[in-house]
């Protein structure tokens, strides 16, 4: 997984944690980034959003009115192995993207990865799917876009029983 790759790359570069069992100042045996990666990546995320605005301008000049946004605008946003973070620092740019989409009449969409499967019989996979889809919905909501800005969802497999899978979708 992507997060495992990130952790592997950072091995030996992370400092020992100064918090253990909620006691400050106690050195633990584990190593942690203490969510420092988000501080490092805020600039990258901000640049991604600015690049999105530039791509929208290019699309408008070339008559392209539908734009699929990258699910990686906010890296690791729904990754269960990474501490959660807020969109607060990016809200002004997200609103600017939404305003530009409305001004240009662009339809913005998301198409989350194939690992999002609503019909799965596995409750853990389903919960992770819900978390990831919520992240995408939150981004579109912050942009204040209408119902034409959609999240395209993979249907997934039938898991040996098409009727039961359809019922899981309905639930």
Question: Model-found features: residue ranges?
Answer:
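Conserved, mostly hydrophobic/aromatic
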Residues: 111
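Alpha/beta catalytic barrel-like cores
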Residues: 1-107, 116-119, 124-127, 138-145
């Amino acid at each position: 997984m992507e997060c495992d790759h990130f952790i592997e790359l950072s091995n030996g570069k992370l400092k020992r944690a100064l918090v253990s069992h909620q006691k400050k100042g106690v050195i633990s045996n584990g190593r942690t980034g203490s969510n420092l990666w988000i501080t490092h990546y805020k600039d990258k995320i901000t640049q991604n959003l600015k690049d999105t605005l530039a791509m929208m301008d290019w699309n408008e000049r070339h008559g392209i009115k539908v734009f699929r946004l990258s699910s990686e605008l906010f890296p690791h946003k729904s990754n269960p192995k990474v501490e959660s973070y807020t969109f607060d620092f990016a809200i002004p740019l997200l609103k600017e993207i939404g305003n530009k989409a409305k001004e240009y009449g662009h339809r913005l969409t998301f198409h989350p990865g194939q690992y999002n499967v609503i019909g799965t019989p596995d409750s853990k996979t389903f919960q992770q799917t819900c978390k990831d889809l919520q992240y995408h919905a939150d981004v579109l909501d912050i942009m204040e876009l209408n119902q034409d800005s959609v999240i395209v969802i993979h249907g997934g497999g039938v898991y040996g029983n098409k009727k039961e899978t359809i019922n899981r979708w309905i639930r």
